[in-house]
Structures are given as structure tokens and as C-alpha cells.
UniProtKB/Swiss-Prot annotation:
InterPro entries, per database record: Ribosomal_uL29 (IPR001854), Ribosomal_uL29_CS (IPR018254), Ribosomal_uL29_sf (IPR036049)
A GO biological process held by the record: translation
Family indicated by similarity: Belongs to the universal ribosomal protein uL29 family.
Name by which UniProt lists this protein: Large ribosomal subunit protein uL29
GO cellular component, one term: ribosome
UniProt keyword rRNA processing present: no
PROSITE patterns: RIBOSOMAL_L29
Record's keyword terms, sorted: Ribonucleoprotein, Ribosomal protein
Domain of life: Bacteria
Pfam families: Ribosomal_L29 (PF00831)
């Protein structure tokens, strides 16, 4: 998810997407621990999405 897409989301949507992304990251980590992922770069991509969403959510809560 791009930063421009993240900025367009409401706070409720940010929280929902953050939950989904954290779950996806957890699932990917578990799958990678059991057997190597075909595309391990997915881990980095999802982790960065989680960080992007969490940063935007924190920024909005402080305003």
C-alpha cells in the first residue's frame, strides 16, 4: 500500500487495515518458519506496510 493511499483512509479504516496487515505478517512469518516462502520479499513488503499504517495512525491520533 502506497503512502498516498494510506493518507486517504479514515482512522477506522487505518485501524482495520493495520489489523489485517499485522495478521498477514504473522501468517507469513509462520509459513516461512515452516517452509521457505517462494517470495521472501513479501515479508519485507508487509512489514513496511504495517509500519506505514501504524505511523499514519499515530500521527493522526496526536493531532
Amino acid at each position: 500500500m502506497k503512502q498516498s493511499e494510506v493518507k486517504e483512509l479514515s482512522v477506522a479504516e487505518l485501524q482495520e487495515e493495520l489489523g489485517k496487515s499485522r495478521k498477514a505478517y504473522s501468517d507469513l512469518k509462520m509459513a516461512h518458519a515452516v517452509s521457505p516462502l517462494e517470495n521472501p520479499i513479501q515479508l519485507r513488503t508487509v512489514r513496511r506496510d504495517v509500519a506505514r499504517l501504524a505511523t499514519e495512525l499515530t500521527k493522526r491520533e496526536q493531532q
